[in-house]
Amino acid sequence: MYEYYSTGKIRSLPQQVDSNGINSKPMNSSPSTPIPNNNNNNNNNNNNNNNNNNNNNNNNNNNRNKSQQSFYLNNNNRNCGFSSPTKPQYNNNNNNNNNNNSNYNHSYGGGGGGTTSQFQQHHLHPVNRKPPKFKISYSVKNTLNNTIIPDRHCFGVNSLAYNHRKSILYSAGRDSTIKSYQIGGGDNDNDINEKNEYGFKFKKSFNDHTDWVNDLFFNDSNILVSCSSDSTIKIWNTDSERCVNSLKFHDDYVKVLAYAPKANYFASSGLDSHIKIWDLSICSISQSFSIDNNNNNNHNSSSNYNQFGDTSILKHITNNSQPTNKINNCNINVVNGNINISTNNNNNNSSSSNNNNNNNNNNNNGQTNTHENTAETSDSEGSKDDNQLSSVNKNGIRSNLSNNNFRNIDNIDEYTPPSSVLNHTPKILSSNGRNVNNRENNNNNNNNNNNNNNNNNNNNNNNNNNNNNNNNNINNNNHENNGNVDVDDEDDDDDDDDDDDDDCNKNKKKYDDNNNNNNYNNNNNKKNNSNDNNNDNNNLNKKFSPMFGSGSYLVGKSGGEGISIYSLAIAQDASFVVSGSTERAIRGWDVRSGQKIFKLKGHTDNIRSILLNDNSTRCLSASSDGTVRLWDIGEQRCIQVFDDLHTDSVWTLATNDSFSHFFSGGRDGMIFLTDLKTHQSRLVSRENEPILKILNNQDDQSIWVSTTSSTIKNYGLSNFYDKNQSIDNNTTNCGSISSEILYNNNNNNNNNNNNNNNNNNNNNNNNNNNREKLSTINEDSNGLQVDEPKIKIQGRAGIIKNQVLNNRRQVLTKDNDNNVQLWDITKGKEIESFGKVDFDKKLEEFNEVISIPKWFQVDCKTGSLFISLESPLCFSADAYQTNLGLTPTEDSLINIGESILYSLFSKWIMGYNLIQLNATTNKDNELNHSNDSVNSSLSSNTSGDNNNNNYNNYNNYNNNNNNGLQKSSSSSSIVSTNSTTPNSGRPLIEIMAKKSIFHLPSNTDVVISDETSGLVLYRSRIEEFTGREQIKIIDWLYNCLETSAIPIKRDNQKISFSVEVNEKIPQNLNAPYYIQVRKICDHVLNNFFINPNNNNNNNSSVNNDLPKGEEFFEICLQNKILLPHYTLGTVKSFFWKQNSTIPLTARVKAQYINETELVKYLKQLSLNHNKK
């Protein structure tokens, strides 16, 4: 992993794979291997610059170390999973002496001509990893009369992607889901989702995110990548319709993604100000893991994705031999805790003209033995050719992993938080056992080194035309002196402006030279290498940092602390990435060197969208300042400002493939189509909500539009423009409004001179005028036609307000259509919808006088109702069934959270119990050699009543897995409760029968997540549990289900009160909060009237058949009669909010005024009962 900051400096964050493949152990240097100092590093770099010809010619210099460097762990990047500072030693074993490496900073991530003085070592403190914190959530369905509302988005839709081959639209919603829709004719006519009037049908909902899905893109390999405010990036296989990887490396919301199709890399960024670049060919490797406890090699291929994700319950294992990665001109050898890195610097930024003369003569003499299973390369055997990649896919990326890299774990001790188990550390890359040195060496000799020579020999080998282009760009470094007003001259209050400008000036010439050289070389390669289909891809990957070889990623900060990145664009070959942020500036980063190469200033507010053309020479940016700017990347200046289109923030841009038109939309709800050649603009649509995303579909000349509402629209553009023509000015009633003068006459003349060799000749012709004109729509003009949408995908209302009622089982909600609904979370469904009524009045109407402790949390941020359970909070509420609206034959005390868990995992309990019984009977079968007895025991044990041998074994199993946490029986000085004590001898089915008070719908979604990492570990419906899911790692859940042990004691929440009877001295008592007033009446009846001299409060067995005390007595607090179902907690919360003892008074009801007769009657009843 690499990290670079606003200063342009780089540091390396190496990662270590332990014996089980987990990135959790520090990489300590070998005690016997000395660690080089920094002075030697500088000397080595100088020697490399001065004596590179000799180094290239001498391939026998195998023991020479290049620019060895000690690296230390970044404590801020805690998601790497390291626990202590690291000092890996980086050695070069002459594996990469093929190519000239002048001016190359051999520090990990170098390659941009930097020196070791630019490298910063960080001595940081250890990282303390937090233990996993599990959370169980379940959905409450928005159903009425058992009719499920169609699966549609609620709230806004942040992003869109389109599969042109299959005509499938993917939408990323603020409801945490990604939904796919078949547009027009599909490949599955038997789909249960019927098409509607617009000719589309719903296909699939991807639900693994837990917060807003902010962006997504789709590539040609049917891989969908999404990012979310839950700080994760998820890789989806749209063919199997499941998540194959979850990347949790951002520290905050991930807001934007950018994809480079030629390199198959993508960039991500967000509110943590980091830019990370990933190798999608490695990230998208399917990780289908088994959750079968009895078969670790069985991969679950269920479309419901019934598995603990790809990173949670499983650990990444490697072989005892440490892996060696060889990709993108880098060898990474992990041996005995040391990392040895040999980097081959195909430095495109080299300024020395004499360093590449002997490149074609340099080849490695060593041989590489690649083993399919171990992928281990011995240092003594040499390495592969420097230009070789490990197993090439269609994009030229090699990314084959060895088999059996993952397995299950069965207990919490082996669990490792998902952030450290990701498949983005140095991993086993192979070419399936084939030795590819010969072919790669030939390519290197014949073609690839020619490209290296062309890239490096700017002064000697480029033709005249290329030199002209270089001169054009080089002169732009000093365009301030030529009368041009550089955008960087605008005022900016950033503290790092001076450093940024210096860094940009240092790297600008290098970037411009390389950019032109790459264009020249690409043309050269087409002529010289037409017979080699893989050569272009190989050359493409040679210029990247060696991080991609290990499946790692690039990390950079844009603007320093407190800067949030909202927009991102990457060149199609991933050569550089551009970011826009709250810094109000556009920063460009060279992926090859990891350094900032330019900074474009001009916007006055947050930059919300950035687009690059195909050859990365032009850039469009949209900002919250209401403007759209067109930039020249080579000249690093703004060449046009579109400031008269929108009246508010511009949030999204879209363009066609030729970059001749662009669409813009924003907070004002207006969508404009602008011609970049003629600067003519036309209004396409006016929405009622702010525009979040515009997706241009050139296949049918339409655009997809999403807004802050939940509706997605498609507008046809056949009446607006031909994709091959400019906007028809004759049919567009536009008023010509002059734009702001960006440049004076001298500037325009200079611009024309400097842009002679650029690809935008039409733009240069327009610059002949003294000032550029921008034609925009006059909204009041006649003839303006705004078309109705061709397709409309309706959304649904989402919950925006909720209130948990006092009974802690019902929730009142209000959606964005102002509809008020009542939900019962113990039933898992909607009870009633009241329509558009006053929320507060309904709340007052349904909120009863009752107090039950909080035991769950409500999550409505995605528009749907989810209930979250965490330990020990979920076990905090005990209540009698009558207080929960139930009508049981016996009013027993239950723990609400425990009963909900039994309902959620009822299918798991049944399946797990049968598996355990089956395993036990199989053991008995081996001992008794009797198949008949086994069959009979299996049939009889289905109900869990027979086979003592099985139960004995089951007892031992439970005792071994019990953590010692037992459920406390509730007790007080008044009454003993019916609390269930755990009995490990009973099978789980028998326990479930008594504990399953609530019955949730079988289609209720159950989600298990780790709050520490923010990843979803498991998602399933109740009916889909099999009993093989490894929930043992959640100890509090497993103990609750198996032994009824909960990590909280009921007796620790007692309330003090006193009872005064017949104006006698009050009796001071205390009892748990859940004791009802009727229990106090029973206490008064028994202890003051029937057995006044009996001090033993445990008389319930004697007086069960006697009348209830509530028939004769009433309990009062300050002359207010308390209802029998009130609990002490209710009395304390509503009627006595002081911290002192509650003074209660017991009095005989009015119909029993003669207290003496009442006493005689009660005593007679007691005597008759005792005689019986």
From Swiss-Prot:
Similarity-based family: Belongs to the WD repeat WDR48 family.
Gene3D superfamilies, A to Z: YVTN repeat-like/Quinoprotein amine dehydrogenase
WD repeat feature ranges: 152-202, 208-246, 249-548, 560-599, 602-641, 645-683, 686-727, 794-833
SUPFAM superfamilies: WD40 repeat-like
Ranges where the record places region Disordered: 1-115, 341-544, 745-775, 926-986
Name of the protein described by the UniProt record: WD repeat-containing protein 48 homolog
One GO process term, biological-process aspect: double-strand break repair via homologous recombination
Key words of the record: Repeat, WD repeat
